[in-house]
Amino acid sequence: MIQTKDDFFALVNEIQSSAYYKEPLAFGIARVDRGQKNPEKILQATFPFINWKENYGSAAIFQKALHETGKLLNDESEAVYDVTKNFVAEALSYCNPWIEEAIGDAHKNVQVIKYLSTLDEEELANFKIVFLFEDAAPKSVEAVYLKLYALSTGKAALRSVNLNGAFGILHNVAWSGTTPIELDWLRENELELKMSGQYPVIDSVDKFPRFLQHIIPADNTRILDAAKVRMGAQLAAGTTVMPGASYINFNAGTLGPVMVEGRISSSAVVGKGSDVGGGASILGVLSGTSGNPISIGENCLLGANSVTGIPLGNGCIVDAGIAVLEGTKFFMSEADYEKIKEANPEWNAEYKEFFKGRELAGLSGLHFRQDSTSGQMKVFRSNKEVKLNEELH
């Protein structure tokens, strides 16, 4: 058993110099929910704590414990192993110098091992240790969840994680609270469950759980309807998600205090101080943006029921009810062209009366409007300040 912190650091150095050690991108220990009909099917992985480009000492200790219990790390991009009694005992013996300090926010990996040491072998069967060695497309449910946690906890930036194929890996299940239930099992047991009064309350049927089933938001973040935010979304402190027409998909979210009353689709990112009005839609990479992810800058206003399909810079306004798409043509006066060019000195487009939406992508200080008499779509230099109510954020 390791007795001192110096002994611990010496052991870590020794492990990291060994042939079996692989430095991970991310790792963690998860409790898994298994299929009711097929226990080999993993429906969900819950991580009490994840490590993302950090805590390499714990990674070394865990890998040594795996090595000592006969597990060999492969050359794949990820590795998932059962947590056994022997693994826990080995890992705990290496963590001895930190055990008394492992409370509160200190030494979360040690806290996880301490908790696991209180479980028997049958209980440990529902725990997995997961390593990601590179940001490749995930191959397991556990790896998908580890990446979703990285996004939702803010340890990985939005759009920085490879989630290719994740939707196909996750199983479509019925969610009752935090419990996933196989649909086949429900069908096979429907009669008995209903006759006995034990049929569960089904909140949703989806491959992704809700954000709040796994993540504790910042104190000044408000989510008024748990169904409106999917796991894998990222909400910066101060974000408010109202009920009704709001929705935030996975790998999408906010970078600061934002009022969300509309839809932020997959891979869309909204800057601080912006307001996504009631029913407004920011298109995702699969819904009309030619695969280009959309960023909305700071202090923008997307009016109620508007549609935004191009990236916007700071201080932009999209009036209620209009669609700003890549191919939409907007009239611009020569005077407004000069003002917009002054606000965006890097923009080197020559003046013309009509610009397509894609030609205006990423510019700041734009105001999109539809003429109420002619129906003509127009864009001009915004002269309004968008400012959120500080009391609400």
Curated annotation (Swiss-Prot):
Its Gene Ontology cellular component terms are:
cytoplasm
Biological process (GO), any one: lysine biosynthetic process via diaminopimelate
EC number(s) stated in the UniProt entry for this protein: 2.3.1.117
Residues in the active site?
E261
Q: Which InterPro entries match?
A: Hexapep, THDPS_M, THDPS_M_sf, Trimer_LpxA-like_sf, Type2_DapD
Could you tell me which pathway this protein works in? Amino-acid biosynthesis; L-lysine biosynthesis via DAP pathway; LL-2,6-diaminopimelate from (S)-tetrahydrodipicolinate (succinylase route): step 1/3
Subcellular location as annotated: Cytoplasm
Q: Which residues bind succinyl-CoA?
A: R263, G278, S281, A304, D319, A320, G327, K356, R369, Q370, D371, S372
One Pfam family assigned to this protein is THDPS_M
Q: Which reaction does it catalyse?
A: (S)-2,3,4,5-tetrahydrodipicolinate + succinyl-CoA + H2O = (S)-2-succinylamino-6-oxoheptanedioate + CoA
Q: What does this protein do?
A: Catalyzes the conversion of the cyclic tetrahydrodipicolinate (THDP) into the acyclic N-succinyl-L-2-amino-6-oxopimelate using succinyl-CoA.
The UniProt subunit note reads as follows: Homotrimer.
Q: Can you say what this protein is called?
A: 2,3,4,5-tetrahydropyridine-2,6-dicarboxylate N-succinyltransferase
**Source organism of this protein record:** Nitratiruptor sp. (strain SB155-2)
